[in-house]
Amino acid sequence: HAQIPTQCLEIERILVDACIDQAACPGATEGQNEMVSFRTGPQVTALTDLVADWPNNSWNGLVQDGTTATLTSILNATITACGLLVEPPGGLIPPGSRVLLVTSTAMCTQANPFTNLTDTIYLIFQAPGNISGHFANHNNGGTISPVPTGASALRTLVLMYLPTNCSDTA
């Protein structure tokens, strides 16, 4: 396990260009299936204390409800290793936790299995509404390809912890 960040949070990875096969998930879009992995700092983090400044979309806020519980259950059923996805109890994420922020509750679970997960990850969801990609990483047009075909378009994500105005940028 990595050390607990000394600051409020630390962005670790971003899954961008999350184009989904329409045959597997009719109606699914890139903006519904992108994800950001981060680790919380030394404080307990409430869902209401987090805000993302997406480079290419508006922030819709985080949601934890029956829909997110169902999604978490479906995704947990794909795990064949000893990992576990959990929603934050009472909307509170413990210090030093690995967190995965999914950009929509309209995600395509069939296209996002967690088969080989071997760790515990707190799973949180942005409220639905954004369908275009959050990062606008490449100009691929309508082309789905294993490598980007368009020109690079650098963007930055800022994830903020409101109580202390602390943030991380990736």
Regions found by a protein language model. Give the residues of each.
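A structural motif detector for short, solvent-exposed N-terminal "entry" segments of globular domains
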Residues: 2-58
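Conserved beta-structured recognition patch
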Residues: 47-57, 121-170
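Intrinsically disordered, low-complexity Pro/Gly/Ser/Thr-rich segments with frequent PxxP/GP/PP motifs
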Residues: 69-109
